[in-house]
Amino acid sequence: MRSRCTVSAVGLLSLCLVVSASLETITPSAFDGYPDEPCTINITIRNSRLILSWELENKSGPPANYTLWYTVMSKDENLTKVKNCSDTTKSSCDVTDKWLEGMESYVVAIVIVHRGDLTVCRCSDYIVPANAPLEPPEFEIVGFTDHINVTMEFPPVTSKIIQEKMKTTPFVIKEQIGDSVRKKHEPKVNNVTGNFTFVLRDLLPKTNYCVSLYFDDDPAIKSPLKCIVLQPGQESGLSESAIVGITTSCLVVMVFVSTIVMLKRIGYICLKDNLPNVLNFRHFLTWIIPERSPSEAIDRLEIIPTNKKKRLWNYDYEDGSDSDEEVPTASVTGYTMHGLTGKPLQQTSDTSASPEDPLHEEDSGAEESDEAGAGAGAEPELPTEAGAGPSEDPTGPYERRKSVLEDSFPREDNSSMDEPGDNIIFNVNLNSVFLRVLHDEDASETLSLEEDTILLDEGPQRTESDLRIAGGDRTQPPLPSLPSQDLWTEDGSSEKSDTSDSDADVGDGYIMR
């Protein structure tokens, strides 16, 4: 009160404050001359911090500035000023870092200077930090269909006084419906640092629940009530912050995946490398257990046999009446008389040597062969001199045959074989050629068809069946005998055939070369 402070002392106190303002410590007797100001000094643990607060009884007085001084009672020391609580207008001060001994008693002196008339007063008391009550921590509640999550936030604790106090003081969570207390929960808090969550279960939907926290201390400082109404359709599990976080994460993942897919389609990443089969482990299991190869559909193939007839040389030795008969080029035995040029026979020889009676059966062919052999033996022996080639004078006793040997192939193929003088040259690709040696040129005019039959038997057991043409059903018609002067070989060595060692006499006037 202003009445308790004399005006004369104002100047002295002001002088003392100015002198001691620069001092960190002063003796307790320095405040003996200050008048006392009635006040209340309290200490509490608020949010794990040791808070010293005071309150003046005369609340109607003018505002004032406060300076805090303290000292330990058990120690004979001077008063120490708290820097962060010097000349301040707040009525509280954090002394957590200053008062480290919980069981000690501290002497507190607060110098009060009124700003109106500059009167100085003091307010002092004895404080024990171990007796400081605990204020409840800050907390949040989240309601669900049938339960409530209570989350408490404990700041980091650096003072041993606070740690010991929180471990020894029971913690209470009061659950109430309206004004009636439903239940009190006393969870055991092992860790006083960080967040702690407690679940209130077995709650009724559509009900308004209120929650309050406090430490069961003397005096107990209770937190204000926080209420929530449980909704029946409200799902449990996630809060709004969790939903926002999940939504943001999904959007980031979608953007990342879309970017990767776009870059892959453009061709900037994930390029395909054609690795060798040795480094291809894509079908590694099939190497160990090979799969059965799938069956393949096979189309049926129908084979249609076709008989292709070979084109044969068609030789016509007689008139046009025999042109429709097929005359092959080779016999089964490999011998032929075709491909040789000679002079034609006379008219009498043409009429007598008609080839209209071909041999069709083996028995009749054998009889005719015997008859032809007998006729040939009756002929007078002719000299073995080989006849001249086709280049002799055509004005001789025999006229050239009018029917020229014709080829059954097209004219374009054998055009190169035609020679001057109506002579036709054929390539005879056989191992041997039979030539008949005539002793008399006049004797060939009266030869009959049976005498002109050629026997190609190389042994006594050969029959006329060897004369059948390969690939045909008919036998070769007998050929008219040619004079020795009209027979010639392909190489033009007919003159050396008489003296050649390779010529062999096969009988009946024939020699084989």
Curated annotation (Swiss-Prot):
Annotated keywords: Cell membrane, Disulfide bond, Glycoprotein, Membrane, Phosphoprotein, Receptor, Secreted, Signal, Transmembrane, Transmembrane helix
Any coiled-coil regions, as ranges: none
CC per GO annotation: extracellular space; membrane; plasma membrane
Biased composition regions of type Polar residues, renumbered to the chain: 344-354
Region listing for Disordered, in residue ranges: 334-402, 458-513
Pfam families: Interfer-bind, Tissue_fac
GO MF annotations in UniProt: type I interferon receptor activity
PTM comment: Phosphorylated on tyrosine residues upon interferon binding. Phosphorylation at Tyr-335 or Tyr-510 are sufficient to mediate interferon dependent activation of STAT1, STAT2 and STAT3 leading to antiproliferative effects on many different cell types.
Positions of glycan attachment: N42, N58, N65, N78, N84, N149, N191, N195
Modified residues (Phosphotyrosine): Y335, Y510
GO aspect biological process, one term: immature T cell proliferation in thymus
Annotated Low complexity bias: 377-389
Transmembrane annotation, as ranges: 243-263
Phosphoserine PTM positions: S403, S448, S465
Region (Mediates interaction with STAT2 (and required for the recruitment of USP18)) location: 421-444
Tissue: Widely expressed. Detected in liver, testis, kidney, salivary gland, thymus, brain, lung and placenta. Isoform 1, isoform 2 and isoform 3 are expressed in brain.
Cleavable signal peptide: 1-21
Side Cytoplasmic, residues: 264-513
Extracellular side: 22-242
Disulfides per UniProt: C39-C123, C85-C93, C210-C227
Superkingdom, taxonomy of origin: Eukaryota
Biological function: Together with IFNAR1, forms the heterodimeric receptor for type I interferons (including interferons alpha, beta, epsilon, omega and kappa). Type I interferon binding activates the JAK-STAT signaling cascade, resulting in transcriptional activation or repression of interferon-regulated genes that encode the effectors of the interferon response. Mechanistically, type I interferon-binding brings the IFNAR1 and IFNAR2 subunits into close proximity with one another, driving their associated Janus kinases (JAKs) (TYK2 bound to IFNAR1 and JAK1 bound to IFNAR2) to cross-phosphorylate one another.
Family statement drawn from the similarity comment of this UniProt entry: Belongs to the type II cytokine receptor family.
Quaternary state and interactors: Heterodimer with IFNAR1; forming the receptor for type I interferon. Interacts with the transcriptional factors STAT1 and STAT2. Interacts with JAK1. Interacts with USP18; indirectly via STAT2, it negatively regulates the assembly of the ternary interferon-IFNAR1-IFNAR2 complex and therefore type I interferon signaling.
Protein name as annotated: Interferon alpha/beta receptor 2
